[in-house]
Amino acid sequence: MPGFYDLFRPLIFKADPETAHQLTLKALKSGLLPPCATIQDQALEVKLWGLKFPNPIGLSAGFDKNAEVIGPAFKMGFGFVEAGTVTPKPQPGNPRPRVFRDPKTESVINRLGFPSEGMNAFKSNLESFLDSRHRPPGVLGINIGMNKNQSEPAKDYTALINMLGPMADYITINISSPNTPGLRDLQKREPLLELLAAVMNERKKSCGDHPPPLLVKLAPDLAEDQQEEIAKTILEAGIDGIILSNTTLDRPDSLPGDFAAEKGGLSGQPLAAKSTAIIGNFYQLTGGKLPIIGVGGI
C-alpha cells in the first residue's frame, strides 16, 4: 500500500520548490501530516558534549529557518534538529525564483541568501517550543549567520549568541553559504581567528555555567591548503566540532545544462561524494580530535 509521501509526491513536485517547502512547513505546524512511526533504541544513542542524542540522524539547518516546526520535526524521529540559519535583523534574502530542483539527478540548487525573520521572532518561536509541556526528546542546535550588509561580522554572531545561546544545546557558526557576499571569506585564517575569538568570548559571558558547544559549518569547495589552515585554526581556537559540508559551487557534468546554469549552491546526490571526502580529510587533519557532523547528499 502506498504511503502518504508516495501519494502526494507528484503534487509536491508540480509546485515551485520554495512554495512546496512553505506548504510543508504549514502542514507540519497545523498537524495535517500523519505521524511517523519512530523507533527508539538505546543502541542508537550517542553521547557527545555532555548531550544525549536519541539517534545520530538529524535535520540539517535550512529546513526550518525560523524555528517554526521544531516539535513536529522531533516527532518525525530525528535525534537532533538544527534550526536556522537565523540572522540578527529580518531580511528577505535574494529575489525569487531562488530554489531549483532536478528530480532525475536528485539535485537542488538554491540562492536563498539567508532569508530570516530575525532573531527576535526566532527567539519567540523557540520559547514556544521550550515551554511546551510535551517537548519530545532530542538535541536542539541553532545555526547562526550574519546579515547581508554587515561589514563587521563578529557583531552579528556575538549578538546572536547573546540572545539565543542560552536556549541552545549547541550552536553552529555558519561561514560557508555561497549566497551571502563575503561570507566564505571568513574561512580565511585571520578573519576566522578573529571571529572565533569573539564568539568564544561571548559564549563565556552569555551562556552561564553550562555553555553550549560551538561548531563551525564549512564549505566543500576548499583547496587542500585551505583545509589544513582551517583545521589548525579551529583546533587553536578550541572549537568543539565541525559540520561538513554546506552546498557546493561545482557543477558535475551529469547535471542538465539549463539547471546547472543556475547560480547558487548545489546540494543533493551530486554533493555526496565531495562532502564525504572532505569529512575524511578533516578527520585526518584534526587527528580525530573533533566530532564531525556529516551533511550533504544524504
Question: Model features per residue range: what roles?
Answer:
Residues G3-V46, N110-P115:
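An N-cap/entry alpha-helix motif that binds or orients negatively charged groups
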Residues G84-V139:
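A gly/proline- and charged-residue-enriched helix-loop-helix capping module
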Residues N66-K75, T158-A159, L222-E236, Q284-G288, ...:
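Catalytic cores of alpha/beta
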Residues D16, L59, V81, F122, ...:
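Conserved, mostly hydrophobic/aromatic
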Residues M146-T158, D185, P191, L215-E236:
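Active-site glycine- and acidic-residue-rich loops that bind
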Residues K52-G58, R135-I144, K204-L222, Q284-G294:
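Short beta-strand/loop segments at the ligand-binding rim of alpha/beta enzyme cores
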Residues L25-I39, P178-P191, K232-L290:
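Glycine/Thr-rich beta-alpha phosphate-binding loop at enzyme active sites
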Residues I39, K89-R98, M119-A121, N179-P212, ...:
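Active-site-adjacent beta->alpha loops and helix N-cap segments on the catalytic face
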